Regions:
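Junctions where cytoplasmic loops transition into the N-terminal start of transmembrane alpha-helices
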Residues: 24-33, 154, 177
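Alpha-helical transmembrane segments of multi-pass membrane proteins
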Residues: 1, 30-34, 42-75, 85-86
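Interfacial/gating helices of multi-pass transporter permease domains
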Residues: 1, 146-150, 174-177
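Transmembrane-helix boundary and interhelical linker motifs in polytopic inner-membrane proteins
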Residues: 2-27
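Interhelical loop/hinge segments that connect adjacent transmembrane helices in multipass membrane
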Residues: 125-159
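Hydrophobic alpha-helical transmembrane segments
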Residues: 87-132
Length: 177
């Protein structure tokens, strides 16, 4: 829902050379995604009769995926493709090594945890990349929300894309199978 408007905001700030607004908008958009999405997903998992460990790791993975999705919008400006690829390979390496270790140790949720570790490593790597590239400060700026007024069609398009991407899953949830 946010990604197209945030992408437009980042593109405009880069064009206007307002680089100091980039990191604060990343923190603010990430916070909004997590504040809105995490409780909803946690409730869904709890209602799906999942164990506490599965709910905890599911919520952790959800948060990591939200942040990775968001940070990739910001990474498009960096054009440091070798460093970005290193982040993906880091995730693969951490996931494979910790997954094999969990199999060897016969851990019940080991594979799930290894995926969380892999995405977490990639997330931290990518956030570090945008911090290295853009002027860093730890403030949040919700200035990008003004772009929802100006580019409401982008927000609608983002919603339609989201529905289209996940419609088949929702149909399966409520279908007879």
């Amino acid at each position: 829902l946010f990604s197209l408007v945030v992408t437009r905001f980042v593109a405009d700030m880069l064009y206007e050379k307002k680089f100091e607004t980039i990191i604060p908008s990343f923190y603010a958009s990430s916070a909004l995604m997590l504040i809105i999405g995490t409780p909803l997903y946690a409730i869904y998992l709890a209602l799906a009769s999942r164990s506490l460990a599965e709910v905890a790791m599911g919520v952790l993975l959800f948060g990591e995926l939200c942040l990775v999705w968001n940070v990739i919008t910001y990474l498009t400006a960096i054009k440091s493709y070798k460093e970005i690829i290193k982040g993906f390979f880091l995730a693969i390496g951490v996931t494979v090594v910790s997954g094999l270790l969990s199999i060897f140790l016969h851990q019940k949720y080991g594979i799930f945890l290894s995926v969380c570790l892999g995405y977490g490593g990639m997330m931290f790597w990518m956030v570090r990349l945008i911090h290295d590239y853009f002027p860093s400060n730890l403030k949040m700026s919700f200035e990008f929300l003004k772009w929802f007024d100006q580019f409401s069609d982008l927000a609608k398009t983002g919603l339609y894309m989201l529905v289209a991407l996940f419609a088949h899953i929702i149909i399966n949830w409520f279908g007879p199978i």
